[in-house]
């Protein structure tokens, strides 16, 4: 059974080509805006624990600000290894609310 929780207001979402951190139930998520499409993933890089939501977007990937690992926001896969990945989550906008499926 899916559980949708409010993660942000629409006005708080990152601009195109940006990522931002949001917290729901004491867990921090990375929300990225790539070409107008929003994606949500775990905020912690599997390499050294860097905050992905503080990174940049490059070639459609979220780049960890600590050591440059790049993640596909649709699959959570890291470029360095197909086995290195973060969890991804569905998000949707309803009116002014942005919801994440936990």
Q: How would you describe each model-predicted region?
A:
Residues 81:
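Short glycine/proline-centered loop/turn elements that form peptide/ligand docking sites
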Residues 1-59, 72, 77, 85-102:
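N-terminal pre-ligand scaffold of iron-sulfur
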Residues 45, 64-67:
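Short cysteine clusters
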